[in-house]
Amino acid sequence: MMKVLVVFALLVTLISYSSSEGIDDLEADELLSLMANEQTRKECIPKHHECTSNKHGCCRGNFFKYKCQCTTVVTQDGEQTERCFCGTPPHHKAAELVVGFGKKIFG
């Protein structure tokens, strides 16, 4: 009976060691993915900054990604130019307001 317990303990030790190696590999892959996401996040355009040259490069807000919102600006010379900035669209603002209100009520 003692031999069976020793063999069982040895098998459990080997299995836990091999599974922890797999977990370490998984954590390394996740870490690389997070580092890549962090690099992308550093390169994105923050809220209220100009996005005229990169309309799909806005950062993420609390719940949604900011959208590049453009307007036509007329200079004193009468020349029209398009100016864009990263911002939160009205329907996203409404959704964030509802979620924030729900969190306050339901905790």
Swiss-Prot record:
One of its GO terms (cellular component) is extracellular region. Disulfide bonds join C44-C59, C51-C68, C58-C86, C70-C84. Expressed by the venom gland. Residues 1-20 form the signal peptide. The presence of a 'disulfide through disulfide knot' structurally defines this protein as a knottin. Keywords: Disulfide bond, Knottin, Secreted, Signal, Toxin. InterPro entries: Spider_toxin_CSTX_knottin, Spider_toxin_CSTX_Knottin_CS. Coiled coil: none annotated. Belongs to the neurotoxin 19 (CSTX) family. 04 (U1-Lctx) subfamily. One of its GO terms (molecular function) is toxin activity. It is found in: Secreted. This is U1-lycotoxin-Ls1b. Pfam families: Toxin_35. Its main location: secreted. Residues 21-41 form a propeptide.
